[in-house]
Amino acid sequence: MPPIETGTVMVDGVSTFFRRVHGDGPPTLFVHGNPTHSEDWQPFLERIQGPALAFDLPGWGRSARPSPAEFDYSMDGLARFTGRFLQRMAVEEHSLVVHDWGALVLIGAQEEPERIRRLVLLNAVVLLPGYRWHRTARVWRTRRLGELSNRLWTRRVLDLGLRESRGDWSRHDPAFIDMVWDHLDGGTFDAILRLYRSAPPDRLVAAGAHLERITAPALVVWGMRDRYIPARFGAAYAARLPNSELVELANAGHWPWIDAPEVVDRVIRFLATDEDFPTP
């Protein structure tokens, strides 16, 4: 497999960490969620034929943490930043693989759907009617309470919090906890508060108002034991994307490829095909 290159690039004055696999043809952009970063995508990057890009959003992972007074950490602000990252990396047509808050890139995809070759959604934040934020998100969205809660995070608290991502409340691998914890700091928590507070339910719905414009083949993979995002929203996303296939995983949670490692190869096969519709 092609090697995975790492580096940083300045985008709007923000030092932005990325992982890249070189190759021919339109690249695939992998966009992480909260509270993780581009290392989430390592199993995919190790298997993809290339080309591919994964980056750390400002405030997360190894990217810089500009002050909220200097940077827009809102859903729309991060969506615009992603567009400028693609511009900086000279990316035009591309495929998308998104997880959790990575769904914010669908804002730009609806505006320029002709640039999207293929789309993969993995337990993505819900840009649809009917979603109510989960318990931790409601804390982050509450002024003063969110700031107070962020002072109380420890590795142990993170471990307990991430168990909610699984229906049986089982522990994640300690290496996964370390991967997340090693890059969480005050700048990340500032970004988290501003991101969640920018996204009341009506704004989420508005952000997904034109999902039908994305006619590229789409694969929706949903871990049904996710306690952050209810199982029904996988089918709801698939119903809004006109050229989609839904894969529901009964024994997987919010990070479906961790609980069901075969997801990685399924996604890689989907990205590699040129057929109009997803393949079984």
What are these regions (language model features)?
Residues M1-T28, Q49-G50, V91-E93, R266-P280:
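Alpha/beta-hydrolase fold catalytic core
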Residues R20-A64:
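Conserved HGGG/HGGXW glycine-rich cap/lid loop of the alpha/beta-hydrolase fold
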Residues A54-V97:
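Active-site loop/oxyanion-hole signature of alpha/beta-hydrolase fold enzymes
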Residues R117-L148:
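Flexible "cap/lid" loop of the alpha/beta hydrolase fold
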Residues G130, L152-E212:
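Conserved alpha/beta-hydrolase catalytic His-Asp/Glu region
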Residues I214, V220-W222:
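Short beta-strand/loop motif that positions the catalytic acidic residue
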Residues R225-I229:
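Acidic catalytic loop of the alpha/beta-hydrolase fold
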Residues A252-P261:
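Catalytic histidine-centered segment of alpha/beta-hydrolase-like enzymes
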